[in-house]
Amino acid sequence: MFAAPPVIETRVFSRMPDRFRKPNKRSEWTDIMLLGGTADCFLEGPSFDAAGNLWLVDIPFGRIFHVSPDGEWTCAADYDGEPNGLKLHADGRIFIADHKQGILQLDLATGAVSPALDRPRLERFKGCNDLFFAADGTLYFTDQGQTGLHDASGRLYRLRTDSGLDRVLEGIPSPNGLVTNLDEKILYLAVTRDNAVWRVPMLPGGEATKVGVFVQMSGGLAGPDGMALDVAGNLAVAHAGLGTVWLFSPLGEPIARVRSCAGVMTTNVAYGGSDNKSLYITESESGSILVAEMPEPGRKMYG
């Protein structure tokens, strides 16, 4: 066990404007994920573009937003889907992990959303959750669906640059956020319902080996969700249901606790700002984007 780490406070960077909220509206997603409850939005998938705009998704209502550096919100797409994760490719294309429709791509010129990978080998995914680009353009993504300790059948995939698809891992109880370490030899995988972050060593050919637990977490109403790495190799882990983002060293030691100033549903994170030391956090209970100043800059992501 470790002593409690120092606390880093947050502030609200921006809140979804009321004109975009859908109060008391139900969807298929809210019926299952919120046990019949309602939500006027549920934010996830933060990712910055080259101009400093923060892109993010609204899962239950199939919307993609971008927020300017001064906090102005724009709805870039509204479609029949459940977008859960979002990442930018180096060429500026936007890829979406959609719980309902698979891996999608957003056309920035038209706002159209189209399939990039929806039925590999004629089979649907369980429900894609999050995604990550390696330096060479390889796309890793998680297929979570409704898996958990009762149904440990979630999967981790790799989409190679030659369009070949590999199943890297299966038998995972709720795979969620993912990111590699600095040299990309280790993949960190948030396993939400196990309340743990797994360490997945990757062989030169891309196969996983000797998978183990990197950090065993506790508490909260959900578990580890989105993650990001800084230039020192420290791992920021959004702990959904605890109102916290944990910062762990490359050895798994807790360095800091970033505390939400809003609700407890801290779902995902992205580094940004002029010096890339600002950690932006989607807080889905209040529909807000929080920000905290971190000790190290975030690693520049692919794209």
Name each region found by the language model.
Residues M33-A51, Y79-G102, R121-L139, Q146-T147, ...:
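Beta-rich, blade/repeat-based domains predominating
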Residues R63-F65, G102-L104, R155-Y157, A196-W198, ...:
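A short loop-to-beta-strand structural motif that recurs across blades of beta-propeller domains
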Residues V67-E72, D107-G111, L159-S163, P201-G206, ...:
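Short loop/turn segments that connect beta-strands within beta-propeller blades
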Residues T10-P17, T74-D78, S114-D118, D166-E170, ...:
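Beta-propeller fold detector
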Residues N195-A196, V200, A208-V211, V215-E253:
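Loop/turn-rich, solvent-exposed surfaces of beta-rich toroidal or solenoidal domains
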Residues V12-R63:
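Beta-strand-rich domains and repeat architectures in extracellular enzymes and scaffolds
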Residues I59-P60, H99, T147-G154, T192-N195, ...:
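Short, solvent-exposed loop/turn segments at conserved positions within beta-propeller repeat blades
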Residues M1-E28, V291-G303:
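Sequence/structural signature of beta-propeller modules
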